[in-house]
Structures are given as structure tokens and as C-alpha cells.
């Protein structure tokens, strides 16, 4: 990936573009440029992968995954960034409704990376959930 591609990807993940520092860009670029990083990117973001995901979502078994959510018996915490452009907030509503013992915590002024953008609040919410 190019530096510009990394910057565009990072900015899509966050609410506050100030989080996308030169240091973060260089770190992610270095990681993505390793043989392992290139292989992961290829598996996750290639045209073939996107076509396979799209075909699966349109196929006759597309609903099957969600059909299993009511079987989850463990207490479940969903964390979501209110301003997530990757998986918008309404994407949390179906699992919230289908998982019997599920709760949702929404972080304001937060994109896809709640654990980075709202680190202290995220850790507090998750720790509180795990200690119950």
C-alpha cells in the first residue's frame, strides 16, 4: 500500500482526524509493508475477497449467521463508536436485539476504533463488564 492509501484508510477508521499522526501513519505503513502485512491486506481487502463477501451476503444462506445469535448464552457486551463510518451504529441493533443477554455501550465522538479513540472510557466499560 502507498502512504496515501494508509492515510485514507486510517482517516476512515476514526472520528477525530488528529489521531492520525505521522507516527501512526509510519507505524501502520511499516507493518503493512512487511510480507505478512501484505498477505493480510490481500486476504482482507482484495477485490476477490470483497466479491466473495458480496456474493455471500446476497446468497440464499446470507441470513444464517444472524440466525445463530439467539443461541449465545454468555453475557455479551457490544461496544460501538457513534460516528463509525465502517460499521454505522444501526449495525449494532440487530445483534443487540437477538443476543439474549446483551448490552450496548456507545462512545460519542468516536469512529471504528473505540479502543484507541476512547481508550480510557473503553477500558473502564470493558473492565466493569468483566468484573460483574
Regions found by a protein language model. Give the residues of each.
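Short beta-strand/loop motif that positions the catalytic acidic residue
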Residues: 72, 78-80
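C-terminal subdomain of alpha/beta-hydrolase-fold enzymes, centered on the catalytic histidine
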Residues: 79, 97, 128
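Conserved short C-terminal alpha-helix that flanks the catalytic cleft of nucleotide-sugar-dependent
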Residues: 31-32, 95, 113
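Acidic catalytic loop of the alpha/beta-hydrolase fold
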Residues: 83-87
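Catalytic active-site module of serine/aspartate enzymes centered on a nucleophile-bearing elbow/loop
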Residues: 100-132
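Short alpha-helix in the alpha/beta-hydrolase fold that links the catalytic acid
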Residues: 24, 65, 74, 88-97
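Conserved alpha/beta-hydrolase catalytic His-Asp/Glu region
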Residues: 3-68
Amino acid at each position: 500500500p502507498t502512504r496515501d492509501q494508509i492515510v485514507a484508510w486510517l482517516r476512515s477508521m476514526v472520528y477525530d482526524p488528529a489521531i492520525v499522526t505521522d507516527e501512526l501513519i509510519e507505524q501502520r505503513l511499516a507493518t503493512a509493508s512487511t510480507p505478512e502485512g501484505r498477505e493480510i491486506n490481500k486476504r482482507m481487502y482484495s477485490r476477490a475477497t470483497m466479491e466473495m463477501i458480496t456474493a455471500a451476503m446476497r446468497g440464499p444462506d446470507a441470513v444464517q449467521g444472524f440466525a445463530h445469535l439467539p443461541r449465545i448464552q454468555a453475557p455479551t457486551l457490544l461496544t460501538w463508536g457513534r460516528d463509525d463510518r465502517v460499521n454505522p451504529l444501526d449495525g449494532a441493533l440487530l445483534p443487540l436485539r437477538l443476543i439474549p443477554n446483551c448490552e450496548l455501550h456507545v462512545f460519542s465522538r468516536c469512529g471504528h476504533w473505540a479502543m484507541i479513540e476512547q481508550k480510557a472510557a473503553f477500558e473502564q466499560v470493558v473492565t466493569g463488564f468483566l468484573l460483574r
